[in-house]
């Protein structure tokens, strides 16, 4: 194999972050931290503009959703899927904004 380790292809149909956000949404957690729109309830204009599906999963990082600074679960899975898709050794997710 020309000195290359055999790679196992990952299931590229997976979307670990989206799956975790949907599971979290179904838990009906009431947030007491940021963002201030409180899953759309605190800002009807924003909800009308972006849609309930968007603001319903716009949440701060918490344990079930992993942490971008030190990913250990769903973000790490997503990074591994990205690396596999690109044929890279590693991939790192970044966000814009605050």
Residue ranges of model-derived segments:
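Conserved N-terminal alpha-helix of the aminotransferase class I/II PLP-enzyme fold
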Residues: 55-98
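N-terminal glycine-rich, Lys/His-bearing helix-loop that initiates the first secondary-structure elements
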Residues: 1-57
